[in-house]
Amino acid sequence: MIDSILFDLIEREVKREKENIELIASENFVSSDVRRAVGSILTNKYAEGYPSKRYYGGCFVVDDIESLAISRARELFGANYANVQPHSGSQANMAAIMALIKPGDRILGMELSHGGHLTHGSKVSFSGMFFDAYSYGVSRESEMIDYDDVRKIAKECRPNLIIAGASSYSREIDFKKFREIADEVSAYLLCDVAHTAGLIATGFHNSPIDVAHLTTSTTHKTLRGPRGGLILAGRESSIIVNYNNKERRLEDAVNSCVFPGTQGGPLMHVIAGKAVAFREALMEDFKDYISRVISNTKAMAECFISEGFRIVSGGTDNHLFLVDLGILGITGADAEKVLERVNITLNKNAIPFDSKNPSVTSGIRIGAAAITSRGLNRDDSIRVAHFVIRALKTKSEDELKKIKRDVIEFISSFDMP
């Protein structure tokens, strides 16, 4: 390679990933086929517009690629409509929100510190800057969504749009209850399933596709695809909405919001990678993979509970859980730094009603999607949990060095996808 500096850095990242236990809930490992597609010659092609409606010539091949990705996404989720062009989940959310409501309208989303996402109404996001944002949270007692409280807040603020979904919530969300609430206040419903898309596609969690007006997702995380976004619609795809002072079908409004509304040319090499990932997710072994993700996550959570830790909401229904570090008297930031020293990666995370600054936090978030992609089973996951607990409890530098050696020896025996 001519650029030896850059490619040496890439090799360093290869080594880091191979010798590291990856517990960040929003990360995963793609297949070699996905990497091949994303690293292909398709990165050369500019293709503003949509299949058969491009602003450039020479798009007949990428038209077929995007159409294939759309077809597979629709099949995977049982959707009537799919847009595979969003570059990220945040951009998918921006386009979906703008297709349904206009700037200044009211939105109701999950409080960020209770497990929501920046794009669900945070003041530092477009969703809180350009819209009148309100929030709902979890019950102080159960640390789960209180749907009666959501209904009460919705009736008080009368939102134009309700967003259901989360980035650090370990329980299954009842999308039908959210739709009932939305209908009661004449609001649209947007479901953001970025974290649980793989569980929904395989039937382990209830699907919002025919419940919500629009559903958004990322294509990485539990879908094991390239980093990117996705917008889906079911039976509501052809309803008429007021977009840009014109009556449009919802799917047409979404298309316009993605391009030219929020993006220019699509990333055709990434869309090809999405197509590969959707095909892989349609295979029977992907359902087995998701089953193992859930099993591994539960096993780790149970291990922490048995060691005296408090798990937010008492457990997990999906691929992640939150650990309250109060028993140790350390912060999430402390834990993140210590664990990185022993080749374990996760992230500090606020817990509901957290008294600490978001840059410090009282908890950590742990996910099993990535380690499961490397072939770890339930017993392996319990061993991983013990590595984490050992590192968090020790005060010895020598013990941390030993844990790091143990971690490298253990995880290096599992192949990268």
UniProtKB/Swiss-Prot annotation:
It catalyses: (6R)-5,10-methylene-5,6,7,8-tetrahydrofolate + glycine + H2O = (6S)-5,6,7,8-tetrahydrofolate + L-serine. The modification N6-(pyridoxal phosphate)lysine is found at residue 221. GO terms for molecular function: glycine hydroxymethyltransferase activity; pyridoxal phosphate binding. The record marks 220 as: Plays an important role in substrate specificity. The keyword Transmembrane helix does not apply. Its cofactor is pyridoxal 5'-phosphate. One of its GO terms (biological process) is glycine biosynthetic process from serine. Signal peptide: none annotated. Pathway: One-carbon metabolism; tetrahydrofolate interconversion; Amino-acid biosynthesis; glycine biosynthesis; glycine from L-serine: step 1/1. It is found in: Cytoplasm. InterPro entries: PyrdxlP-dep_Trfase, PyrdxlP-dep_Trfase_major, PyrdxlP-dep_Trfase_small, Ser_HO-MeTrfase, Ser_HO-MeTrfase-like, Ser_HO-MeTrfase_PLP_BS, SHMT-like_dom. (6S)-5,6,7,8-tetrahydrofolate binds at residues 112, 116-118, 247. Transmembrane segments: none annotated. It comes from the Bacteria. Gene3D superfamilies: Aspartate Aminotransferase, domain 1 (3.90.1150.10), Type I PLP-dependent aspartate aminotransferase-like (Major domain) (3.40.640.10). Its EC number is 2.1.2.1. Keywords: Amino-acid biosynthesis, Cytoplasm, One-carbon metabolism, Pyridoxal phosphate, Transferase. One of its GO terms (cellular component) is cytosol. Catalyzes the reversible interconversion of serine and glycine with tetrahydrofolate (THF) serving as the one-carbon carrier. This reaction serves as the major source of one-carbon groups required for the biosynthesis of purines, thymidylate, methionine, and other important biomolecules. Also exhibits THF-independent aldolase activity toward beta-hydroxyamino acids, producing glycine and aldehydes, via a retro-aldol mechanism. Belongs to the SHMT family. This is Serine hydroxymethyltransferase. It comes from Borrelia hermsii (strain HS1 / DAH).
